[in-house]
Swiss-Prot record:
Belongs to the xylose isomerase family. This is Xylose isomerase. Coiled coil: none annotated. The active site is at residues 107, 110. GO terms for molecular function: magnesium ion binding; xylose isomerase activity. The keyword Cytoplasm applies. Keywords: Carbohydrate metabolism, Cytoplasm, Isomerase, Magnesium, Metal-binding, Xylose metabolism. Homotetramer. It comes from Bacillus cereus (strain ATCC 10987 / NRS 248). PROSITE patterns: XYLOSE_ISOMERASE. InterPro entries: Xyl_isomerase-like_sf, Xylose_isom_bac, Xylose_isomerase. One of its GO terms (cellular component) is cytoplasm. Its cofactor is Mg(2+).
Length: 445
């Protein structure tokens, strides 16, 4: 049985508290670039980056894949049922402390097992939520967001809010109702809706309009219930184009924003954008961030990376400095993420089965984003790309371009202008020069 909070089991005993030692350090259990108290711009790194550990990949994953059995035997796995759930809480808060992360995130079924009935399941959840709340009282860690797992249990074979079965819709509503109560209880700064199985495999058996309408009804019910109980955290939707269904309804940032506007939900939701999901959608991560940012929907980030050579969600820890730099470039221009953060929705590789690998992985991701933050800040401070972009679009600052921007032009006036100016001269986009500059900043800042 898991020990009480007064007689804790020690986990990660080979790991001391991870400290910043600088880029010259050879210590694999130290930060090289992430210095939480270092000021970048007008805030500390800790304030700018708002790192979060994902409960599911870190404390429940066992390395199972479609081709093989579990490879990861964690110290807490000797327990089962509710004892296992309690042991995971102990392990989680010890790792939070050792990595000095300010936030964590979870699905409801990550922290507590399902019972034979919804009532029993909720009772299990209440026990663990109370335990987590007690641990939070003596910890600096906060809940970035929680969400509902409405994709693992076979009842969700056809989806949850988009299921063809009204009984499933009702069950999903009850589950999210409990999730919102949990969010309020633990002070979650956000609540996430991930599509899970909200999509379809073939139109031959799908009433697409009804499913989308029902999804919107479900979201509105969530908004209404949050207001009813006084939960004021930010609602977030996490886009994904495919997997597990062939066509997920929240395909990408643009699709999801369109859905929110179509159903009048745009004032209640922002987006939680994942790098690997951008890859699956055929976009760069910075594209998704930019689309959300310029429309006012950038809320939070699931920090990971995908493998462009593979067609599935690999959820690797983020180590690509180009990606972290360009991501932070967007986030800084957004004025930060507000109540959102950088949640490591990432898992160690199946062959990285030792507990220390969990620490190495988070250090790598935190260092990569710390480096990206500093480079992005310097790029913005020097107006490297802004000056070039301003010059590239200079034709819209006066003359016919200004008339277009101000809405004073029409097809008649534009035709007359074109007839009088038949010689058009374009300028180079200078992509290669810009990439060389980006390289220089990444290498030198």
């Amino acid at each position: 049985m898991a020990q009480s909070s007064t007689n804790k089991v020690s986990y990660f005993e080979s790991v001391n508290k991870v400290l910043y030692e600088g880029k010259g350090s050879k210590n694999p259990l130290a930060f090289k670039y992430y210095n939480p108290e270092e000021i970048v711009g007008d805030k500390t790194m800790k304030e700018q980056l708002r790192f979060s550990i994902a409960y599911w990949h870190t404390f429940t994953a066992d390395g199972t894949d479609p081709f093989g059995a579990a490879t990861m035997q964690r110290a807490w796995d000797k327990y089962d049922g509710m004892d296992l759930a309690k042991a995971r809480v102990e392990a989680a808060f010890q790792l939070f402390e050792k990595l000095n992360v300010p936030f964590f995130a979870f699905h409801d079924r990550d922290i507590a097992p399902e019972g034979s009935t919804l009532r029993e399941t909720n009772k299990n959840l209440d026990v663990i939520v109370t335990m987590i709340k007690d641990y939070m009282k003596t910890s600096n860690v906060k809940l970035l967001w929680n969400t509902a797992n409405m994709f693992t249990n076979p009842r969700f074979v056809h989806g949850a809010a988009t299921s063809c079965n009204a009984d499933v819709f009702a069950y999903a509503a009850a589950q999210v109702k409990k999730g919102l109560e949990t969010a309020k209880e633990l002070g979650a700064e956000n609540y996430v809706f991930w599509g899970g199985r909200e999509g379809y495999d073939t139109l031959l058996n799908t009433n697409l309009k009804l499913e989308l309408d029902n999804l919107a009804r479900f979201m509105q019910m969530s908004v209404d219930y949050a207001k009813e109980i006084g939960y004021t955290g930010q609602f977030l939707i996490e886009p994904k184009p495919k997997e597990p269904t062939t066509h997920q309804y929240d395909t990408d940032a643009a699709t999801t924003i369109s859905f929110l506007r179509q159903y009048g939900l745009e004032n209640h939701f922002k987006l939680n954008l994942e790098a690997n999901h951008a890859t699956l959608a055929g976009h760069t991560f910075e594209h998704e961030l930019r689309v959300a940012r310029v429309q006012g929907f950038l809320g939070s980030v699931d920090a990971n990376q995908g493998n462009p050579l593979l067609g599935w969600d690999t959820d690797e820890f983020p180590t690509n400095l180009y990606s972290t730099t360009l991501a932070m470039y967007e986030i800084l221009q957004n004025g930060g993420l507000g109540s959102g953060g950088l949640n490591f929705d990432a898992k160690v590789r199946r062959a990285s089965f030792e507990e220390e690998d969990l620490v190495y992985a988070h250090i790598a991701g935190m260092d990569a984003f710390a480096r990206g933050l500093k480079v992005a800040h310097k790029l913005l401070e020097d107006r490297v790309f802004e000056n070039i972009i301003d010059e590239r679009y200079h034709s819209f600052r006066d003359g016919i371009g200004l008339e277009i921007v101000e809405g004073r032009a029409n097809f008649h006036t534009l035709e007359q202008y074109a007839l009088q100016n038949s010689i058009i001269k374009n300028q180079s986009g200078k992509q290669e020069r810009l990439k060389a500059i980006l390289n220089q900043y990444i290498l030198e800042v």
